[in-house]
Structures are given as C-alpha cells and as structure tokens.
C-alpha cells in the first residue's frame, strides 16, 4: 500500500495516514521565541482512531514505536507556554479544540481526534477552547530536557537553549522517513 504506514496499537492495527503536514513558520513575538529555523507541523487525520477502544493508547504506541517517549494524557494548558529545551508531539485522542500556536499573534488551529502536531522547541501554544471530551497524548524525543516557560524572564535563556536543542532522529508519527526529517533541516 503505497503512501501508507501501518502502526500497531496494543490490541489492533491502526492505519497511520501518510499525509503532508501543514507547516507554520512562527516568528519571535517578543515574549514567545518560537523556533528560529524549524516550523510547527500539524498532521490532519494522521492516525485512524475510529475503532480504537482506547484511542490514547494508539497515539502512545505510535509515538513510542517511533522513538518518542515520556508520554502523558491530558489537555493543553489555557495559557501560553513553551518548552525551550525539548520538542513536543501532541496527538488528539478524543474531541476537538482550537489551539493558538506561536504566541498571542499566532494562528489559531482547530484540531480534532486523529490529528497530530509536532512543536519544535520554543513553540508557544495554548488552548483557546475545547470540547468536554478533549484528550491529548504528549510525547518527547530522547534528546532534550523538559522545561516549562511561561514568564517574560524565561525568554533570554530560551533564546540560547532553543538553538542548542538537537533535531530528533525520527518523526513521532512516521518514523525515520517522516516529513519532519525534511522540514527540520
């Protein structure tokens, strides 16, 4: 099946649709640095969840099989924040939301179950609104260190650490040959 990758969930095979992601190049807005070189990637309908009894487990499995770990299940904070020392993958397991990326002047993107986003270090994000059942699975590459930046004084240090955060070896959804590899050069 050309153009499609199969990902195994803990109980059943689930298709990971090989679609080109939407790329967002986000600029430093004076509070949120964003990444100076690499775009935010948003994969619409990246993972098929239609028959999954535990859709979050499907994302956990896809991320882990592609070398991204430290998974968690939750929502997205309702305030602008970013991580300056690590990249982050977000998979929408249930529901839908409007998420603002890049800071207060950044785009508001609607995400729904099955969508995934990959945020390079420094990418601001916050939940604008969400359905009551909204559930996200987050994951991180093995390189980097988790931090949470929310204050103006975090920015100066972040400008240095963001640039030093290495490119991950794999795309969290599609592995070693995923779109992230070409987009983050």
For each predicted feature, which ranges?
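A short beta-loop-beta micro-motif enriched in histidine and acidic residues
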Residues: 75-89, 104-105, 111-113
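Conserved metal-binding segment of the jelly-roll/cupin
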Residues: 111-131, 140
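A short, N-terminal "cap"/entry segment at the start of jelly-roll beta-barrel domains
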Residues: 1-81, 181-185
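Double-stranded beta-helix
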Residues: 68-69, 75, 94-96, 104-106, 128-185
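Short, conserved beta-strand element in jelly-roll/cupin
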Residues: 83-100, 118
């Amino acid at each position: 099946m050309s153009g499609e990758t199969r990902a195994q969930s803990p109980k059943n095979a689930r298709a990971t649709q090989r679609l080109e992601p939407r790329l967002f190049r986000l600029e430093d807005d004076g509070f949120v640095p964003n990444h100076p070189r690499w775009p935010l990637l948003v994969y619409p309908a990246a993972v098929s969840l239609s028959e999954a009894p535990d859709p979050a487990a499907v994302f956990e499995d896809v991320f882990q099989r592609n070398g991204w770990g430290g998974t968690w299940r939750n929502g997205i904070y309702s305030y602008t924040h970013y991580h300056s020392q690590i990249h982050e993958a977000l998979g929408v397991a249930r529901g839908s939301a409007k998420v603002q990326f890049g800071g207060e002047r950044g785009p508001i993107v609607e995400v729904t179950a099955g969508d995934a986003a990959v945020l390079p270090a420094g990418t601001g994000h916050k939940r604008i609104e969400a359905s009551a059942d909204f559930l996200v699975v987050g994951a991180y590459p093995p390189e980097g260190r988790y931090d949470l930046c929310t204050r103006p004084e975090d920015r100066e240090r972040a400008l240095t650490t963001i640039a030093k955060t290495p490119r991950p070896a794999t795309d969290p959804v599609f592995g070693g040959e995923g779109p992230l590899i070409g987009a983050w050069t």
